[in-house]
């Protein structure tokens, strides 16, 4: 089964997302999928809170004149804006945009709050719905008209040095987040023609899907003083002078969820990282006639023991065990514990890992400690496999001064190996003309194993 078909199929079978809503590019997070989303964004919120960010919530509606205030910024997506033009039957004097992103909204309010250097730094974030009128082929959780989980952070600083330090913090923070959810990535500095509109520069996180295409999963933008000058974000410096703040912004969306689903899944279904799994352990009682009560009593005891540390589900449905195994493998539950009469007699239980399929017999009297060890191994294995997967999709090619020869070499590598092709960095081919020659996207300038490369790939 091709990846595209597998992806659409697993969203339905595993109860992640239902795209049958009657608006293109809009769908519904189902309960199981929503829990994956919730646990993932809890990790992200914790990382932000621990680094001095404050969560907030801004309006969804943006007046047209406010959105248009930063001309270069709005040009980047003016064809994708949804507009509210009426209140009931009454035409509005000023059209209202459904939030495509929140720079203009937040910076209007920051002007009210920032007066002196002691008001800085200001580090805010929100997790909200955003709207883009996508005209391309929409894909669930990947390319949406309503992005249902957009975490955007916006910061303001007194100096360029503080602003640069914030970029480093954001990159480290996002790296830690993707490590936690076991999504591998490379970081690139986007080329000038592909940076965020209005930014000095953009750093981006990309991962690689099983079909060899890359997915942008996070961006970090250094805005310099560009937006501050437009929105008059001035403050009084310690020596009494006036200056504009320096700003950053950075975002992560539903693509993080799409990626953790896509990167580790297999022919059986999902393979979910432990920390974001709605159910971390599923208990399967093996019932035999005359032994039902003994088994159920013991497995309920086990359920109570494990629930002190893990999210556990006891599957006591009246169906065959094989059907239960299949159902929970589709949903990617990390560990399955089977318990039957013989296990009880022997003082044992059987643990099955979703990531490797390995079956491990453990002593029941020591089961909590054994589960903790296996969970730790599961986490480590998923991280190792994530790194291996992205390395297997990276190809370094030798530089050719002949642009046409180099482009043919890159196209051949993309065809044969897919993934990301790394070209030793050279200004002569770091341009849109080369991008057209290779019929792929220049992701940007990437450091890999201590060397600078131009990274190129076919993208979603």
From Swiss-Prot:
Q: Which GO terms describe its molecular function?
A: ATP binding; proline-tRNA ligase activity
User: Record's Gene Ontology CC terms?
Assistant: aminoacyl-tRNA synthetase multienzyme complex; cytoplasm
Could you tell me the EC number(s) of this protein?
6.1.1.15
Main localization of the protein? cytoplasm
**One matching Pfam family, short form?**
HGTP_anticodon
Per UniProt, the enzyme's principal EC class comes to: ligase
Which keywords does this chain's UniProt record carry? Answer: Aminoacyl-tRNA synthetase, ATP-binding, Cytoplasm, Ligase, Nucleotide-binding, Protein biosynthesis
Localization of this protein: Cytoplasm
An example of a Gene Ontology BP annotation on this entry? prolyl-tRNA aminoacylation
Q: Which reaction does it catalyse?
A: tRNA(Pro) + L-proline + ATP = L-prolyl-tRNA(Pro) + AMP + diphosphate
Q: What is known of its domains?
A: Consists of three domains: the N-terminal catalytic domain, the anticodon-binding domain and the C-terminal extension.
Write out the similarity annotation.
Belongs to the class-II aminoacyl-tRNA synthetase family. ProS type 3 subfamily.
Self-association state and partner proteins as the record states: Homodimer.
Q: What does this protein do?
A: Catalyzes the attachment of proline to tRNA(Pro) in a two-step reaction: proline is first activated by ATP to form Pro-AMP and then transferred to the acceptor end of tRNA(Pro).
Q: What is this protein called?
A: Proline--tRNA ligase
Instruction: Please tell me the species this chain comes from.
Output: Methanococcus maripaludis (strain C7 / ATCC BAA-1331)
Taxonomically, what lineage is the organism?
A: Archaea, Methanobacteriati, Methanobacteriota, Methanomada group, Methanococci
